[in-house]
Design a protein with these regions (language model features):
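Exposed beta-strand and adjacent loop surfaces of beta-rich binding modules
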Residues: 50-52, 94, 141-143
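Glycine-rich phosphate/pyrophosphate-binding beta-alpha loops
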Residues: 12, 16, 71-85, 150
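Gly/Ser/Thr-rich active-site loops/lids in small-molecule metabolic enzymes
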Residues: 27-35, 78-80, 86-107
């Protein structure tokens, strides 16, 4: 059984998806403030168990071990200004990938600012990859959230739909900036 979904920003698996699930549950109950997402991250950190994951990028096995979380996308920012993919470029035709290996709470706590200032790859537990086609298998299955919405579980495949979005802008904008956008297809 396969589903096709599209994303415009970032997808998260494992820990990321658990945080989104807790956040959605609390919002549904009427709770809402600017620190709610951070609170959900902290609560999830102590209950999430890392999962055995295999990651292929462009048909090359790049990771086969325990992972806490995975972020895949075309943009830098998600979840209230976090930069899980600080080197992502929306129009380069590639998906950026951050693989977060199991890490102790205190190690992350003292480096939490890197998640917001673009320095996430300074944390030794976080690996960076890039490619046009990403495949993920895990045991047990891990959940996935796409642009903040829970969508399903592994196995997952991500690929880029080149120049799939057309944007109408003024000539003045084109003279200043040139960023044709792309979308991603989640299979």
């Amino acid at each position: 059984y396969r589903q096709h979904r599209y994303m415009a920003n970032v997808a998260g698996m494992g820990f990321d998806a658990m945080v989104v699930k807790k956040y959605a549950h609390l919002k549904k109950k009427g709770h809402s403030n600017k620190w709610l997402y951070t609170w959900c991250m902290i609560r999830s950190f102590f209950s999430y168990k890392s999962t055995g994951v295999k990651v292929w990028i462009d048909d090359r096995l790049v990771y086969n071990n325990l992972l806490m979380s995975i972020a895949i996308g075309v943009c830098k920012y998600n979840g209230g200004g976090m930069q899980q993919l600080p080197e992502a470029v929306a129009d380069d035709g590639l998906l950026d990938v951050s693989l977060i290996r199991p890490v102790h709470f205190w190690h992350i706590l003292f480096r939490f600012r890197y998640l917001f200032n673009g320095g996430i790859y300074r944390i030794r537990h976080i690996l960076q990859e890039r490619g046009s086609r990403i495949r993920i298998e895990s045991s047990p299955e891990i959940s996935v959230e796409v642009d903040g919405e829970l969508l399903g579980e592994s196995p997952l495949e991500f690929s880029v739909l080149h120049r799939a979005v057309r944007i109408v802008v003024s000539e003045e904008f084109l003279k200043r900036e040139s960023y044709p956008l792309c979308s991603c297809n989640i299979v």
